[in-house]
A protein has these predicted regions:
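N-terminal cysteine/histidine-rich coordination modules
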Residues: 1-78
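Arginine residue identity/basic-tract feature
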Residues: 4-5, 36-38, 57, 70, ...
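Weak global preference for isoleucine
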Residues: 6, 10, 27, 62, ...
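Long C-terminal interaction/binding lobes of large macromolecular proteins
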Residues: 42-45, 90, 126-232
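Domain-exit/linker segments immediately C-terminal to small folded modules
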Residues: 48-133
Length: 232
């Protein structure tokens, strides 16, 4: 699938003048040279008013289709659905298997998913790892609230991965690294409890809320196992 774009009318919020902008609905880094960089650094979403020079970053639905690495990330601003089925895409790629398909609500999560899949990682396991480490970070910072967190570093040779969390009232960034053993443990939990999710069709929203549900089920399972042992 090559890139697809449409032209839309844009009204400048500063001067009120109307102009046009190219809006990309689908991009494929394997086909279009340089589009990956333009997507990740925000250039693809940049817009400048030709009348007054006001600059802004447009936010609109866009499908990032990386067939080389076999994943699709659908950025739909502020989407709150867990699952999105696109019949046209499902039919078009019905002969392809093992393609990870995700929906994300923000530009940062869009970039993170691309980084995760390009690194050859399982995003479900990454989300569970991120959640577990965020609890450690919160305790480390005296119970500070953790607002968001993103995978920001992965080094397989050094057996390390790192996350950047935004903490406290000022959303202060905090970088926390961890050994890959935590990720490996998370993957075992995911393989045990999320096997049904892995079989679902369409685009899935795998995020903190999803990870919290998996962690809750895991703790409940362990609690039941403990009670059963006491009864023996």
């Amino acid at each position: 699938m090559p890139e697809k774009k449409i032209t839309k009318a844009i009204v400048c919020p500063m001067c009120g003048e109307m102009s046009k902008a190219d809006v990309y609905t689908s991009i494929n880094p394997s086909v279009t040279k340089g589009v990956r960089r333009r997507a990740l650094d925000g250039e693809l979403f940049a817009w400048k008013c030709p009348s007054c020079g006001y600059s802004a970053r447009l936010t609109y639905p866009i499908l990032y289709n990386d067939m080389k690495n076999r994943f699709m990330v659908y950025f739909i601003p502020k989407i709150d659905h867990f699952q999105l089925c696109d019949k046209e895409l499902e039919e078009k790629y019905s002969n392809l298997r093992n393609i990870s398909k995700r929906i994300v609500p923000s530009f940062n999560s869009f970039k993170e998913k691309i980084f995760i899949f390009e690194s050859g990682l399982d995003d479900m396991s990454v989300e569970l790892t991120k959640l577990a480490i965020s609890q450690t970070v919160s305790k480390k910072l005296g119970g500070a609230e953790i607002h968001d967190g993103y995978l920001s570093m992965y080094d397989r040779e050094r057996n390390t991965m790192g996350f950047t969390y935004f903490t406290g009232e000022k959303h202060t960034p905090h970088v926390q690294t961890a050994r890959l053993e935590i990720y490996v443990k998370s993957k075992k939990i995911v393989d045990s409890l999320a096997y049904k999710d892995k079989k679902l069709k369409g685009f899935l929203k795998i995020d903190r809320e999803w990870a919290e549900n998996i962690l809750y089920r895991y703790k409940r399972m362990k609690h039941i196992e403990k009670l059963n042992k006491l009864k023996e």
